[in-house]
């Protein structure tokens, strides 16, 4: 059977993570025992005569251990136990590298791009996406309005507006005359977005939210408090 493995240059991956200020000194693949199946699945596997593997490959990150600014040791951690932000960056970098290695003309879609990423790191990645070294097309979604003022052209920014029927409408900032009349560096799109210049701002009734919480407290709070005593 032909191997379905894909090659990723580990040295370059580690260098990229290091430049992104992540303390990962190496990446290793370990053979680890597979998780046991529950009784029902185990029975199905046996009835179908499926050869369930006893081991599986798992990715580990290696971190340097410091004491008084000196490296005294290193430790391994499964990628699955890394923080959400570290895993997020790892997957983004992996997608970028695979695209670079396979023609550098791919379209990569990343939902919730900034999830658990520091805003400076997210902005740096956007600059990389727009660099001359990158010929791939990235389509990203984000809730971080600070990225509106990152290294993006006006025609690259789209906002998703939802009406009272719950129907979403995708519109470009380029379509707003107010945005086109000024140079890219003369305007804060994030500030104007918060001012409602482009729409797509959620209408939140804070007083209504507080009223609901107060109503819950008055209706259930005292009764539950008595039951606990």
Indicate residue ranges for each PLM-predicted region.
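Walker B catalytic acidic pair
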Residues: 111-113
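Conserved D-loop-proximal element of ABC-family nucleotide-binding domains
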Residues: 115-119, 123
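Phosphate-coordinating catalytic segments in nucleotide- and nucleic-acid-processing enzymes
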Residues: 1-99, 103, 189-229
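C-terminal lobe/lid and adjacent interdomain/linker elements of RecA-like ASCE P-loop ATPase modules
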Residues: 124-229
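Walker B motif beta-strand of ABC-family P-loop ATPases
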Residues: 107-109
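A short acidic (Asp/Glu
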Residues: 39-40, 120-121, 150-151
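Histidine-centered active-site/metal-ligand motif
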Residues: 63, 118, 143
